[in-house]
Amino acid sequence: PATEGQFGKDITMESWRQAVKKVGFEDLIEAGLGGDMTTCSEAEEWLEAYRNGEKKTTSCCPGFVNMIRKHYPDLADMISTTVSPMCAVSRMIKAKDPDAVTVFVGPCVAKKSEVADQKIEGNADYALNYNEILAIMKAKDVELEPAENTYQDSTIFGKFYGNSGGVTDSVLEYMKETEQNEDIKVCKANGAAECKKALMFLQRGRLPEDFIEGMA
């Protein structure tokens, strides 16, 4: 979902779909669909933890997860077990075609470390940042061209995952729609500094909120 709007208002998901097919990919599926898929799982996990008096952190940002595992290993058990939207979409594709090779494209370099983690079954096989996919397109003489925004896989809530606080917005909306209106409070940490501060409070038992949404 972070791809929309990054290259001008006229460059849509359909623009990207046409371009990647020209360079040799079979098709494009929006990672925001994975946001829709994982929101349900994330919400149920949050609700269970909340009702048990436990605190949790989100798991969709690999930079944040790496920060916890490296610098706050005692908090690793608090990381949500819900897979990232990237992984959810990859698993869906591979369920339909076990021989498919899946490639994630986005702005986050840390996605490469998530791909390299072989413990995550069914995850994307490769991750490319924007510079890399644009270099491939340039080598193939392919350009992103304006196209009508007709190609959408995800809802607006799946697209929220591309913004800080988006996971929280999606999960709380899901809870509202399913009439599970618990008074859950979330610390929205955007950037490494805010993530470190939130984790320090959690580590010391001083985090007032129930969950941390971390986007490092």
Name each model-derived stretch.
Residues 1-216:
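Iron-sulfur-associated redox domains of electron-transfer enzymes in respiratory
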